[in-house]
Amino acid sequence: YHLGAGVEVPLLHFPLLEKTGIVKEGFTTRLGGVSEGIFSTMNLSFTRGDEEEAVRENYRRLASALDVDYDKFVFTDQTHTTNVRKVTAEDAGKGIVKERDYTDIDGLITNEPGLVLSTFYADCVPLYFVDPVHRAIGMSHSGWKGTVGKMGAATITAMKREFGTEAKDLVC
């Protein structure tokens, strides 16, 4: 990985994923936001007690750093499952500007350009999947339960079912 430079919000980038040319990606740090106190500064959680407007501003800054639309984020609803959801243009903004109409989702997959798949981590593992052949992507959250439950395999299986993805073609 490498740390992006010259932006308000520092992001870790993964060159292997960038080289595919079909995905913008970034892994946030705690830097570059407006949250204060124990949430300082780049808090991206609406569920931990931070000021909602501060979290929204943090997402605006993140969207700017990624050069994506703020209302295109799509959030998981992580509960340490192996559930994967295909998201479409109708899901844009769910979790940030619209209510989610789903629960218990630890992985997201899409072939819809412009959507920003968003997963969250503390001590769990981020899983990134890029299928350059079918121009599809996936992101999954895998804690110990997801790892034991084979979250990576569940995500690949969902991508194969929905997009025809073959594991041999994936950049992870």
Protein language model regions, located:
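A general structural signal for short secondary-structure junctions and capping/turn motifs
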Residues: P15-K19, S64-D67, G164
